[in-house]
């Protein structure tokens, strides 16, 4: 493998054995591709905005004299970029402009004669745009639209599994689900009649639908039954024989023909009998007359002489009727062929319970069921039925639905109409009856071939179509009513309903979620999440166990591990690493093709349905170098089951061992050694890790860290290769390689970095450059690390030296003992940024004012405010401090005589306003890092706002002019090169000012042309600079668009530094979570023979019962990695020769059996080896991919190479006594995370505060500044102790004795610690409640 300069800085040793056939795909493509499909113009009109427009337009007037046609659309440029939208709290969106054509036809002229055509571009609201990272900025906050897993449109056959009826009889049903429109259900009842429901309403006999489709009884029977034909000859009854139909029956008479008796009376008819009959080609047999009694006739029989109906279709024959038929000359009788085995009489029975007899009565019956209480008319009934399933406006199966429908009915073509046909309905009924007869299978609803993914683009398109349909009605009215000659398309379209529908979807849909932005992994996981909830999906309460369960088809498509614990378990899933959706929205996963027993590198993506037809080998199957299977029998999956197959039966093989799991689970090393429940917790807790101040790459990783860090978008990645020309904390400039430049550009790429920005979860987003001046860069290299990334690798926590041993009960029940060194070195110190906003509104009594002149506030409280009343940047504030001074006018109150006097003397007006300043919440302290002031248009800006504006302008100017200088320098260096090549001496050029170079002429015409081109570019650059600066200035100085009634908003950003402390929650990556119980002095911690103390002591009892052994293997491997790092560090300190260093590092990389990674350090220069060693001295990072990781033998080898005992256990000494512990302890390095459940956010203390209105008891919870509830059980405890006075205090003055607590407070202030308990308010509430039941209780004084 060839490494780029940047990749050579630190190479992760990979223990993976299987070759990587397929690179990990871009992890956010499910979001970006879907949205791209939505907004890009599709000439076919199959999907996106184009499809929505084409489905609604053209809109015709009721009279048909005019229509509004759609021509095309375009999306404009967004007004603000993403960052500006976040700061200003607006939506990042682009205006949608649609070109419409109004066509007016001549009234009297023949059809289609055009009178007038008007074309115009119409504004149709704003469409939110997706950022490069797959998110949306809605009202300033980043949101994610989660993909939905819903039931695919199509037809499904199912059964109730015997749960509906008490007899336990299995009732089958079929359901046709369209993409939009009414559902059509067919179901059997316990009496085996077939019923139909429309939209889950009252059920009707299924034949009503057929009658409504104009079928007669005869035609219905003809469709569903085979006929048995009897001939009456010479007063004898002969039956046309189909021998196969006799199978399994018992002969009720001798079956004979031409004197041969084939079956005797009373004998069961077997296959042998049938073969004999077929062999002898017996076509007719004579049957006794009684045999036909009770059979059902297949058609109407009429006496031809009189026209009298002798017997109607579907009536049972009797001997009398038979005689009548015979007399009237009918010699051929057709009856229905039914039996109890596989030809049930269901439709025949259903026709009997069907109250209708013709089409009209059927339509009326359907109308009554759909619109109960409305009087049916023929026209209304016909329209209703037509619109239900046969109108393209109201009903659409969609391409997916039609494909699934046809596949289910075993048709060859997969395309077709989006509405139902007669044939569709009959085929569904036939298949359902077949299933009832025991032919065919019911579908599995939870199979991923029956559930599809609906992504952002599709949901947005549906929402947009809803908005368009609302507009359509209004347009129809306008076309019919308005004066068409003066109307323009713009007058007809009201963009409000469209933008409202879109806004509603992005702002408040259940699937539009506030992005989880704790760390890069939580962002990526949120975007790859798949939810079964949401509109058109399941509900938590109704979802049973089957839906939530892992299904065999989840393999390689949906992760079996990563799902929330709690009520949503199994309903919210995560996409597997390699999974993608196909054109129909079904999940597919890649496999390697196997041809003639050889595994090729040809990759096919298979959906769940296609996969069922193949035999698929696992990724860890042993292959030889040519790709043949080593073993004769191979473990494979086929039709959802695992079993052994011979090697020539195999069709496909898995692409990778990580194929099964999601991104989150693929980051857990040794996942294969963890119990699934703990792995689930591990995968979920990684998403809650808070980015630490100094990111630290995991010593033991899985090799996925780089992919996650780069794809998440938190790092700055080089778009093109080049050389680093300039680096500072907030900007990186790359001079692009010649071969990657576009013709005629300056060839400079500038990357501006994000500094100290607040994330959605109040953690800190900050980018730091990780390249140096002059370094060569290749496309795709990481230039700057974001939060939780270290040299372009995901780094959620810190590598800690852990020991598994008990320590004085401080690690009882998963508690964690931490060394003070961890705090001193700031290993788990995190920065949290809070945004506090102060809003100044216009009230009825006058505007609120932001000012430093606040009544009744001392000088000290105002010391951190400037003259405008806004806090300085850099001020350190604590709970209760004023951040923004604000006063609100209050109503005139009745003045006391004293106040009147004071007013008269001093003219004091101060009491007209009350203090409503923004203060720091209790328990929060931090540093002000930024202040933003937003002022409404037309409101005068205060001094601070103008200062901020000036600063922003200065900064913008500085940024742009620096950019210009860099680009100019690039341009002039090319001009210089050109002029020198053209024969001008370099010394002479240096004497001339650079601007004059452009005036020089060259004799070579070609070079002169190039020079003129560059001169043009230079002018363009300057012009562009002026334009950009002007645009920036306009943006900064314009007023802000604030909500109605808001004059000013001041936002203050506080940075809070939080060190780790007892009560904080920590976890490893294997579901091993705990709470810090104590921070122990370094000298008290257990230490090894070298005197190195451990950082963290964990309880060994947390491992065996939880079966997450992965943490132990990680600890051993981490120890080995650290040992090798220490050896490298020792060699660097001794300043050993580079050759020795190279040899040792090479040994470490080469260690292990049959690993795929080949690192050849001989191709590295000495400087590169030294830089690599410098980055490896803290420990050599190791990758152990999921299900393909390091073996025990390899871990032992690595431990020995690092000069450590191969058992992974060492002798420890007690830090307090210096005594040796009696047995060896497992010590190593484990990657620990600090989770976003910090004690500072959870704990608070209350003295006095607010009370509940009715019970007068203190509120609960930190948000309400509430108290700690002393509940029923706690009262029992005090009663049991007999602590009477404590109990009295708890139930009265400490809770809801209103007078008592007020007195108590006064007494404490006066230094008199007496208490006088009174009547608790809750007792009064109880009295009131009893009185409300009509029982009067009164308390009497004795």
From Swiss-Prot:
Gene3D superfamilies per UniProt: 2.40.50.100, 2.40.50.150, 3.90.1100.10, 6.10.140.1670, DNA-directed RNA polymerase, beta subunit, external 1 domain (2.30.150.10), DNA-directed RNA polymerase, subunit 2, domain 6 (2.40.270.10), RNA polymerase alpha subunit dimerisation domain (3.90.1800.10), RNA polymerase Rpb2, domain 2 (3.90.1110.10)
GO CC, alphabetical: DNA-directed RNA polymerase complex
Gene: rpoB
Catalytic activity: RNA(n) + a ribonucleoside 5'-triphosphate = RNA(n+1) + diphosphate
InterPro entries in the cross-refs: DNA-dir_RNA_pol_bsu_ext_1_sf, DNA-dir_RNA_pol_bsu_external_1, DNA-dir_RNA_pol_su2, DNA-dir_RNAP_su2_dom, DNA-dir_RNAP_su2_hyb_sf, RNA_pol_bsu_bac, RNA_pol_bsu_CS, RNA_pol_bsu_protrusion
Entry keyword set: DNA-directed RNA polymerase, Nucleotidyltransferase, Transcription, Transferase
UniProt similarity note: Belongs to the RNA polymerase beta chain family.
UniProt-listed Enzyme Commission number(s): 2.7.7.6
One MF term in the entry's GO annotations: DNA binding
GO BP, sorted A to Z: DNA-templated transcription
Species assigned in the record: Erwinia tasmaniensis (strain DSM 17950 / CFBP 7177 / CIP 109463 / NCPPB 4357 / Et1/99)
Record protein name field: DNA-directed RNA polymerase subunit beta
SUPFAM superfamilies: beta and beta-prime subunits of DNA dependent RNA-polymerase
Source organism, top-level taxon: Bacteria
Role according to the record: DNA-dependent RNA polymerase catalyzes the transcription of DNA into RNA using the four ribonucleoside triphosphates as substrates.
Assembly description: The RNAP catalytic core consists of 2 alpha, 1 beta, 1 beta' and 1 omega subunit. When a sigma factor is associated with the core the holoenzyme is formed, which can initiate transcription.
Organism ancestry: Bacteria, Pseudomonadati, Pseudomonadota, Gammaproteobacteria, Enterobacterales
